[in-house]
Design a protein with these regions (language model features):
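Single transmembrane alpha-helix segments in multi-pass membrane proteins
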Residues: 3-66, 84, 88-92, 96-103
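Transmembrane helix-bundle core of multi-pass membrane transporters
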Residues: 11-16, 105-173, 200-203
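Membrane-interfacial loop-to-helix junctions in multi-pass transporters
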Residues: 15-17, 25-28, 69-76, 152-158, ...
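Short, amphipathic, aromatic/basic-enriched membrane-interface segments that mark the entry/exit
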Residues: 16-20, 77-81, 148
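Hydrophobic faces of alpha-helical transmembrane segments in multi-pass integral membrane proteins
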Residues: 26, 30-33, 54-58, 62, ...
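Short loop segments and helix-boundary regions at transmembrane helix junctions
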Residues: 39-47, 68-135, 170-175
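Residue-level recognition of membrane-helix boundary sites in multi-pass small-molecule transporters
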Residues: 48-51, 74, 105, 155, ...
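Membrane-helix/interface signature in polytopic inner-membrane proteins
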Residues: 166-202
Length: 203
């Protein structure tokens, strides 16, 4: 068993693998940050997977349609905006139902994950006529983050670190963060002090 665990640790943190592991951790941390405001309100959003899939789908479309036609810097910006907007729209749907009809956000967002999975699978089949369900690097050659100091994933990790700090400041020191905290503690209290609870939930 010791040798097995040693192999696992070496595979994750050994030479050349540390940044890959940190990159994977950064992705998971970024997804966690996306649902942090909802959890702060004690609304159990289990739809992060669906939002990520829809965001990935929109960025892949941008790569396929605009790759090679616009500079990579502009393409990355378009992809980022597209991913954020598509993820927000996907998240607003259960938030709207929760705010207006008090639906169960856990089940709603969980079911939307399966809708997102089917949508991505459908578009994979449209893009890939071979039936392999893979749109590989040969098609997605533009819009990748550049290397910094020859390090492939450093920029990704730095961006997530900045987002993490920004989220902490937003939740702890902003008016919106205060409203989120109050709604999470007590919706009745939030109503009493004049907070628009429906607006906070959807936002």
């Amino acid at each position: 068993p010791i040798s097995i665990y040693a192999t696992i640790l070496h595979g994750a943190f050994g030479t050349g693998r540390m940044l890959v592991t940190l990159h994977d951790i950064a992705i998971l941390l970024c997804i966690s940050l996306a649902v942090t405001p909802a959890f702060r309100m004690r609304f159990w959003n289990t739809g992060a997977e669906g939002q990520v899939l829809i965001g990935c789908l929109s960025t892949a479309v941008c790569m396929l349609v605009l790759g090679g036609k616009v500079p990579d810097g502009l393409l990355i910006l378009i992809m980022a905006v597209s991913a954020i907007l598509s993820g927000v729209i996907w998240g607003i749907i259960p938030a709207f139902f929760k705010a207006h009809w008090n639906t169960n956000e856990t089940l709603f967002t969980l079911m939307m994950n399966y809708v997102a999975i089917q949508l991505v699978e459908y578009f994979l089949k449209v893009a890939d006529k071979t039936g392999s369900n893979v749109v590989g690097p040969d098609l997605l050659t533009h819009g990748w983050f550049p290397e910094i100091f020859g390090v492939k994933y450093l920029l990704n990790i730095l961006i997530v670190a900045i987002v993490c700090v920004a989220m902490h400041i937003y939740l702890r020191y902003s008016k919106h963060g205060y409203e989120i905290a109050v709604v999470g503690e007590s919706e009745n209290t939030a109503h009493y002090i004049g907070i628009d609870v429906k607006k906070v939930i959807i936002r």
